[in-house]
């Protein structure tokens, strides 16, 4: 991880206030983001963007192009990762490692909630930054147990 971060730090820059037009263009060009967020919840997304969502972008220092984005919500001193995305070029250049490391090093954030992963490779990636598995309780009931509902 240290070697990858050293390389990424020399090739990438962190941008927190990417221009609105450039951000829209970048996010709209992502098929996954388009299908999961914009097609179903565009009005909610843009409203949240103005109030609660935070973004980190990994920018190529030579071309000034965004290679990755890390979307999160910050509440108090806790950051909740919502949508980490890396382009193919960003993957080659460790852009997500660069962004997560920047988030972890942010003094205004004490806890980063990686929002878990059932995919081992992703869970292992997050573990490099100190993520630990957290078990959560769930409650499930059948309506037949509650005949008056």
Regions found by a protein language model. Give the residues of each.
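A conserved beta-strand-loop-helix scaffold within acyl/acetyltransferase catalytic domains
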Residues: 1-91, 128
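Aromatic (often tryptophan-rich) hydrophobic motifs at membrane interfaces
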Residues: 52-147
């Amino acid at each position: 991880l240290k070697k990858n971060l050293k390389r990424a730090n020399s090739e990438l820059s962190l941008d927190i206030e990417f221009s609105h037009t450039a951000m829209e263009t970048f996010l709209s060009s992502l098929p996954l983001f388009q299908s999961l967020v914009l097609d179903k919840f565009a009005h909610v997304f843009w409203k949240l963007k103005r109030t609660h969502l935070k973004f980190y972008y990994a920018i190529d220092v030579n071309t000034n192009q965004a290679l990755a984005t890390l979307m999160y919500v910050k509440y108090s001193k806790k950051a909740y990762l919502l949508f980490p995305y890396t382009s193919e070029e960003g993957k080659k250049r460790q852009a997500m490692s660069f962004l997560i490391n920047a988030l972890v090093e942010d003094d205004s954030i004490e806890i980063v909630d990686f929002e878990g992963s059932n995919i081992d490779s992703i869970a292992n990636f997050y573990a490099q930054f100190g993520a630990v598995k957290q078990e959560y309780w769930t409650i499930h009931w059948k309506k037949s147990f509650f005949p008056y509902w």
